[in-house]
Amino acid sequence: MQRRAPPSDEAPGGLRAFVTTRRAGLGALVVLVAAALGGWALRGRFAPDLRADPDMILWPDAVSVTGIAPWVGGDLKDVALRDASLDGGLPLDDPELPQRLARAFGMHPWVRDVVRVALRHPAAAEVELRCREPVAMVAVPGGLLAVDAEGVVLPSEDFTAESAAAYPRVSGIQSSPVGVAGSPWGDPVVHEAAAVAAAVGPEWRDLGFRDLRLAEHAARRGWELVDAAGRVIHFGAAPGGEGEGEPNVAAKVTRLRALAADPDRPEWSDLTVPP
């Protein structure tokens, strides 16, 4: 009987040949895997110590905020951080921390823009804001709602009866806001009224106006300013909506300033036609 020869260690494709020819590569791979596992082990060992470092934990009292307007009531910083669940210790090494802080402050109804968020070490943060400015109070059943120049509803609970009286009162509005404070009212009529109130600005107080209302018998939608004595100034269209031949908002405001200086101004004035 013919005896079968034992398998040769040098047979091509054999395990020993593979190991022999790949020995250098396998050695390098083992070193890389060991280094990676060692890195993860070190990270797991020392990461808790990094987070335990008080200089790496950001607390609310180390967050400074600039740009908060004087008409903003309450503690804007505390409310913004609390509502975003960021009122605990925050790891300074979180790469998304600046964005999280920006989102938290940007969600506050008084905040128009988050201008800048800067982190510092030891753990501190600087946040710069631009706040919305109230320009009018819209009369609704049960009270007044503040709006800015773009018709965004503001937190009316921050106003007293006395402070609310310093702003134009928009009357005759039939709608209600479509969202919460910090959202646009959602009615073009309210947005127009807010634009008129913003354009009139300081002249409102100088002229002693009481109400801003829709013109009752105008051929096209326009606005009237009414003072405490019942005298009316027809302002006309909101800024940007002027008809053909109607003066622009700058010309109207110039006329308003002249009327403010005239103690004997008439019962009715019309800013949509030349004086």
Predicted feature descriptions by range:
Residues M1-S64, R82-P275:
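Charged, solvent-exposed interaction patches on well-folded alpha/beta domains
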Residues P70-A80:
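Membrane-proximal extracytoplasmic alpha-helices
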